[in-house]
Amino acid sequence: MSYLNPQAIVSTEWLSRNINDPNLVVLDGTYHLPTANRNSSEEFPLKHIEGAVFFDIDDIADADNVLPHMLPSDEVFSEKVGALGINNEKRVVVYDVYGMQSAARTWWMFRFFGHENVAVLDGGLPKWVKEGNKISSSPITPSPTTFVCNRQSLLVKNLNDITEIVKSGKGQILDARSLGRFNGTEPELSLIHI
């Protein structure tokens, strides 16, 4: 299979070959929906890819916004990812416990803040484990570094942008939720859609 942006996805085989690269940071970007009654920050220390650090979307967000997981300021993102040992030269690979669900959001956040050298692990932790690769419960203490944001504002649309897209028909809006969440037959924080 070919991809429009093949650098955006790496295979488990690639990660297995490159796991010890000092220029690589592996991130667990797992986020569970509130209805799952699970806590990814509590689960991470029990089982993660060896050498991975945890990207906490609850912490790396705009704390002043009433909506969850809104993008943080450049300063907050820089501080938090720098504390994870990520600078602008590092290659970042993101995975999650579902395969590719929440890892894609973490990937997009890095792209939004100007980090292009980021990829999602195809198949995530389930595929990694199924293939017999190393997992760990050992804590990792990353060496803090400096990450400089280069915000890519075109990757976010506001209400006026969305309204114009709907009116003009010059774009397509996709709702990434499951059909049940979209239709309101499964629990959802917001029972609306465009």
Regions found by a protein language model. Give the residues of each.
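Cytosolic catalytic domains that perform sulfur/thiol-centered chemistry
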Residues: 1-192
